[in-house]
A protein has these predicted regions:
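Extracellular beta-rich repeat passengers
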Residues: 317, 336-405
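Active-site-proximal loop/turn and secondary-structure-junction residues that shape catalytic pockets
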Residues: 83, 234, 281-283, 315-317, ...
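Right-handed parallel beta-helix
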Residues: 101-102, 139-147, 213-223, 236-247, ...
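Short glycine/acidic-rich loop motifs that flank beta-strands on beta-rich extracellular proteins
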Residues: 74, 86-88, 108-109, 129-130, ...
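The right-handed parallel beta-helix/beta-solenoid scaffold, focusing on the short coil/turn
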Residues: 43, 75, 82, 87, ...
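Alpha-helix capping and helix-loop boundary segments enriched in small/acidic/polar residues
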Residues: 53-56, 252, 256, 260, ...
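Extracellular "leader-to-stem" segments immediately downstream of a signal peptide or signal-anchor
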Residues: 2-6, 10, 16-78, 83-96, ...
């Protein structure tokens, strides 16, 4: 049945709506104006100048061009038109990695070519095989251009890995790598001893920015990711603009800022196998160890074609989530379960507050405009009950959904 849902002044645990609404949208403008974009010297480095002419992969050429560019004060590393295959790329400060219009960058699925790096997998700190593009502690960076990057993930490689490889326990039982990671977290094993590499490595993210600042991701297309597509982690001042995300594998979230501050996601296209955007801040004891929220997140002018939720907060939200603005987005898919979804449980905990949503057009979604779950994953009890408050929705129009809330 066709339903028209005009949710002007839908208030969840809110008082003084009109006054707060005006002030908070003004605050969004302040946050936006204080997210700096990176700048680069007018110097160009072609990856083909660093290619030896014999390697089957361009990994060495790309990473050497990036290292030289950064060491010489920065500039633009250009991947010219053409098809290139590579292992993981390591980004560095003051480098703009630019994909030309007709560039196709394909990533190998041979995990033996992947280094081991510090990251988080589903909110749990560990060392894992490297994301396809990784940066740690870098500043003033960009990945730009209209080219395509293909993670090559399929059932023939990454998505069957957990079933085929896994980890063999002392009793001979084989379990998935993430099951071992969950157990290490529950046993409070230190981060540096949670190491997954080579055959025991878990599916990596496409782009992982760990403790980075002042980063621009703009223009390119991401296809077939092994895991989450864009994962800023413990980072600040990140702009994701005009990026097309097309990936329908398991856990293929589009953009997941985790324990981040000042994030702008605008004019992007999401066609993903999981949440289009999922804001996170760590999980359980790891999240409480860091206790760093995600805050000041702006999502605007985006198109969500497919995915589980349009914009989610959680479920790994232990560190909290504050000040989220979502506006002027189009969401339309029978596979979108909820337009806005907030999820946690009494083990993960976390406070979510000050979420402002307006001017959203929904062609259809499967379940509801807003979903809030405090017993996510069927967890009824625990010592850390989550707290969701100050959630505002205004001018949400849906042609088809089973429920409002």
């Amino acid at each position: 049945m066709k339903r028209f849902l005009n949710c002007f002044m839908l208030i969840i645990f809110i008082t003084a709506f009109c006054e707060a609404k005006v002030n908070q949208w003004d605050k969004m403008k302040e946050v936006y104006e204080n997210i700096p974009l990176p700048t680069f010297p007018d110097k160009t480095y072609l990856i083909t100048d660093y290619y030896n002419g014999t390697d089957s992969l361009y990994t060495s050429a790309i990473n050497k061009a990036i290292s030289v560019c950064s060491a010489q004060g920065g500039g633009v590393v250009v991947i010219p038109d053409g098809v290139y295959k590579t292992a993981p790329i390591r980004m560095k400060s003051n480098v703009n990695l630019h994909l030309s219009d007709k560039t196709l960058l394909m990533f190998t699925t041979d995990y033996n070519l992947f280094d081991t790096v510090l990251t988080r997998i589903e909110g749990i700190d560990c060392y894992n095989i490297s994301p396809l593009i990784y940066a740690y502690g870098e500043t003033n960076m960009a990945i730009t251009g209209n080219g395509v990057m293909d993670g090559m993930a399929s059932e023939a490689n990454w998505f069957s890995k957990e079933r085929i490889d896994g980890v063999t326990l002392k009793n001979g039982k084989k379990v998935a790598e993430k099951t071992v990671l969950y157990d290490l977290k529950e046993d409070s094993v230190p981060f540096e001893k949670r190491v997954f590499k080579g055959k025991t490595g878990m599916r990596p993210q496409f782009i992982n920015l760990y403790k980075c600042k002042n980063v621009l991701l703009e223009g390119f297309t991401l296809n077939r990711s092994p895991f989450w597509l864009i994962h800023p982690l413990l980072s600040e001042n990140i702009t994701v603009r005009k990026v097309k995300m097309q990936s329908h594998g398991y856990n293929n979230d589009g953009c997941d800022p985790e324990s981040c501050k000042n994030i702008l996601i605008e004019d992007c296209d999401f066609d993903t196998g999981d949440d289009c955007i999922a804001i996170k801040s760590g999980r359980d004891e790891d999240g409480r160890y860091w206790n760093i929220p995600s805050e000041n997140i702006i999502v605007r002018n985006c198109r969500m074609k497919d995915g589980h939720a349009g914009v989610a907060m959680g479920s790994e939200i232990t560190g909290g989530c504050y000040n989220v603005w979502v506006e002027n987005c189009l969401m339309d898919s029978p596979n979108l379960s909820r337009i806005i979804r907030i999820k946690s449980n009494a083990i993960r905990g976390g406070e979510v507050k000050n979420v402002y949503v307006r001017n959203i057009t929904v062609g259809q979604c499967d379940e509801s405009i807003l979903g809030m779950e405090m017993k996510y994953w069927h967890v009824d009890d625990g010592p850390y009950p989550p707290y969701f408050h100050n959630i505002y929705l205004e001018n949400i129009k849906s042609n088809k959904s089973r429920y409002l809330l």
